[in-house]
Amino acid sequence: GKGILNLQSPEVSGFFDQVIAYYSEPTLKNLYKDAVREYDHVTDIENQLGKGFAFLKANFPNMQIPACYMHVSGFNQNVLAADSLLSLSIDKYMGEAYPLYQDFFYDYQRIKMQRTLAAADYLAGWLMSEYPFEGNENILLDRMIYEGKIKYIVHLALPEITPAQLMGYQEKDYEWCVANELTLWNTIIQRKHLYTPDQITTSKYLDDKPCTFLSDETPGNIGTWIGWQIVSSYMKENNASLQTLMQQQNAQEFLSQAKYKP
């Protein structure tokens, strides 16, 4: 409740008036109706989740498989994870052309707000819940590798989702990343961004906003994309299990073992 709506605690004066006002807001009422209508039938998502969680269970035998729910959050957090359950904010997956999105989100945000990515975000949310980030959140390398691990595993679990879709990129942007991977990596190294604990700089690499501080063509979240390439290299070099992949927490050691050469 409180975490979803950004409301005060029930003890605060006027709390219930605030709740009533929130849910009476016309835009939210329309959003709720549209979301319930869009997700009246979810067989496609159930089938994807069945395959995806079966893959996770095969590779993480001790992992508990959560009960999966849906909710309307009013454009708040995409996925909520709690003990043995996950809930997806379906109002964030209405399709990039959904009219209400036009006033609230940029193009680079709307491209991710697709029904086809719902199952992927369930899986990513659960992996993050089961294997929370334990590095230094201000160090780019730590964040890149962690986010890259999540993308790598979700793509293995749901291979029908293309890497470009999983990143929230247009195909042309993904192809640009592939063609410019070496230049991107060299730029990060030359600017000494990889190991320097700088929260502001690190967050720029992981924001959905286009990374124009690197070049005009660089799409957003480029840190995650490069992290994914490092993880792919690590898995080719080490033939590790996915459990070993998630348990390797030392990012510098991981990079060394990956022998990443874009």
Which residues does each PLM region occupy?
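N-terminal mature-domain "stem" immediately C-terminal to a signal peptide or N-terminal signal-anchor/transmembrane
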Residues: 1-21
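A cross-kingdom marker for long, charged
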Residues: 141, 145-262
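Generic serine detector
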Residues: 9, 13, 24, 73, ...
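Alpha-helical protein-protein interaction elements
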Residues: 14-15, 31, 114, 187, ...
